[in-house]
Amino acid sequence: MANHKSSLKRIRQEEKRRLHNRYYAKTMRNTVKKLRATTDKAEAVAMYPGVQKMLDKLAKTNIIHKNKAANLKSKLAAYISKLA
């Protein structure tokens, strides 16, 4: 257990940040799964800008790595283009 006031505060901050990051990472994963489950091209095209925006914001705030965001966006765009 931490003994210093500052280290106790750091523990509180890290826990709060961890929960915040977990929430947004899970939300991102669910949104990507929902887009991948879509078989209708029009619906997928409508969803894609929102997913892309979410990935960019999460990469900007270091919740996910920028390369992971780029890879996901690329794969989702390829998936949408293959839909009939």
UniProtKB/Swiss-Prot annotation:
- Quick one: a GO biological-process term for this protein? translation
Keywords, A to Z, come to:
Ribonucleoprotein, Ribosomal protein, RNA-binding, rRNA-binding
**GO annotation, cellular component aspect:** cytosol; small ribosomal subunit
Is Ribonucleoprotein found in the keyword set? Answer: yes
Q: Origin, by domain of life?
A: Bacteria
The GO molecular function terms of this record are:
small ribosomal subunit rRNA binding; structural constituent of ribosome
InterPro entries named in the record: Ribosomal_bS20, Ribosomal_bS20_sf
Q: Which HAMAP family match?
A: Ribosomal_bS20
Sorted alphabetically, which PANTHER family does this protein's record hold? 30S RIBOSOMAL PROTEIN S20 (PTHR33398), SMALL RIBOSOMAL SUBUNIT PROTEIN BS20C (PTHR33398:SF1)
Q: What does this protein do?
A: Binds directly to 16S ribosomal RNA.
Which family does the record claim for this protein? Belongs to the bacterial ribosomal protein bS20 family.
Query: This chain belongs to which protein, by name?
Result: Small ribosomal subunit protein bS20
Q: Which organism is it from?
A: Phocaeicola vulgatus (strain ATCC 8482 / DSM 1447 / JCM 5826 / CCUG 4940 / NBRC 14291 / NCTC 11154)
Q: What is the lineage of its organism?
A: Bacteria, Pseudomonadati, Bacteroidota, Bacteroidia, Bacteroidales
